[in-house]
Amino acid sequence: MRKKIYFLLCLLTISLMSFGQANDPLVSNCVMNAGANARYLKDFRIQLGKATTQGEPRYKANMSLWKNTKYRFTLCNSEDSKGQLILNLKDDTDKIVASSFDQQTGKTYSFIDFLCNKSGIYQLNYDFAGGQQGSGVGVVSMIK
């Protein structure tokens, strides 16, 4: 009888502890903005102060992407951000293969779709336009 009570007590404790992190509303909204045909894979929370010099993006992360898979990179800013969150996606040769910022028009896109032509490790480079300070979220999804 004691073993059953102990087992039930352990089971109850584990089930109460198994709840994940509290939902971040910015992440939740950004996942919803990715679209109904997008399957969430990962998010990156970015918080940066004002840059002292312009140049290389200040937040870098690596991610493995698979050939013949279409990905959507969704970018969301918090309300108090001074600049717009931008993403440059680089392949293993350090070549930019996709960007949310069009240098010719100066337009920043809230998401970009990328069809991966070569499996490998890709570098996600995040920053805020003009080196401004801000916080935001980058969500990576797979398109069905």
Residue ranges and their predicted role:
Residues 13-17:
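N-terminal signal peptide c-region/cleavage motif recognized by signal peptidases
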Residues 21-59:
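Non-catalytic extracellular/lumenal accessory regions of secreted precursors
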Residues 60-78, 123-127:
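Hydrophobic beta-strand segments within beta-rich accessory/binding domains
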Residues 80-96:
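Short, surface-exposed beta-strand/strand-loop-strand elements in extracellular ectodomains
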Residues 114-132:
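Noncatalytic modules at the cell exterior or secretory-pathway interfaces
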Residues 130-143:
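Edge beta-strands of jelly-roll/beta-sandwich modules across compartments, strongly enriched
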